[in-house]
């Protein structure tokens, strides 16, 4: 393969919508049917390299990284230091910062300081452009370094932001469940009161019916006595 073809292939892999890999042509219905028998032969150690190997999922990465779409990705998400990337770090590390504040508070303080520095350098850049535009490079480089440091600090702050967002979500869910429980208790209380009212009405109706039956029986007995006396 020539150098031009190699560069072209690398560009294809790392493009926004990369084309299908070349081994996609081996994913046919016929090969899928042969795969089970081929796996059995592989377990027995009787098979050599075959195009059916492309149908077998790759093993888990044994190292701490893997390659996908022309880039190397770390299995464990780790944010590298700016110094390892060759960029000047404008803020102290947390262990070197103020001891009386927490980690995220220190990051907030440094973000504010870098934001002020960014505004100051922008004003200085405008002044340089108005006096001698040829001297802009150093100020632009300073602004770039400040922006990279701000972006790096924001990325370091994201774990705390995720925890706080999760806490807020759980608190909202807890408050919602408490409100639902309160609504259920209110409905149960209303149902209990209605049942008590129904029971009271039933008792009153039963007592009224009993009194009516007693009065009727008394009137009947009196009429019977009167008829007997006559």
Curated annotation (Swiss-Prot):
Location(s) in or outside the cell: Nucleus
The keyword Transcription appears for this protein: yes
GO biological process: negative regulation of transcription by RNA polymerase II; positive regulation of transcription elongation by RNA polymerase II; positive regulation of transcription initiation by RNA polymerase II; RNA polymerase II preinitiation complex assembly
Chief place where the protein resides: nucleus
Gene Ontology CC annotation, any one: core mediator complex
GO MF assignments: transcription coactivator activity
Disordered: annotated segments: 1-22, 206-230
Keyword set, alphabetical order: Activator, Nucleus, Transcription, Transcription regulation
One Pfam family hit: Med7
Family annotation (Gene3D superfamilies): 6.10.140.1520, 6.10.140.200
Family of this protein: Belongs to the Mediator complex subunit 7 family.
Role of this protein: Component of the Mediator complex, a coactivator involved in the regulated transcription of nearly all RNA polymerase II-dependent genes. Mediator functions as a bridge to convey information from gene-specific regulatory proteins to the basal RNA polymerase II transcription machinery. Mediator is recruited to promoters by direct interactions with regulatory proteins and serves as a scaffold for the assembly of a functional preinitiation complex with RNA polymerase II and the general transcription factors.
Subunit structure comment from the entry: Component of the Mediator complex.
Name the record gives this protein: Mediator of RNA polymerase II transcription subunit 7
Record organism: Candida glabrata (strain ATCC 2001 / BCRC 20586 / JCM 3761 / NBRC 0622 / NRRL Y-65 / CBS 138)
